């Protein structure tokens, strides 16, 4: 009975949030996804050059913020330059599986906030992050932090609105995602979506998804 009441309470709390809080990928406030930003816009950012922007685009997609961080470090950017750049571009981190080091790459996240991120795992929805982290920061800081994270979307049940929060997923690819429902395994997703995009892009999209019930 207690579990049922807790589940009902959670449902009510999540339902009580504005629709934007339901999105499973944090809404951009100051950043653009590093895998989808144009080369021209990238070249204008602090610490970037046209040559570095071109090289970064050629190396995409990056499947984690760690991979992007290694690229930028290898390109000779200082930690200060990289941190400043992460105020403008980033690769979302999975709230449920990101390593401590990945989370600490989010600008302004120190050991104290890291503990709060980890304390509430596993996150059933981004609304849980919104509710729990709201205890520690104001609304502006909450929105800033939320833009760096995501909770995987269920490939079989996610709404159109939620799926469209995946960076770079437009209405055409949304139709392809839905056409092959229900998916009986991730291999089918890879096979079917691989008809339309490269295997690297399939892997980039896949990181935002789950088939777990």
Model-derived segments and spans:
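N-terminal targeting signals for Sec/Tat export/insertion, comprising classic cleavable signal peptides
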Residues: 30-63
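Accessory alpha-helical DNA-binding modules that contact the DNA backbone or grooves
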Residues: 52-97, 113-156, 173-212
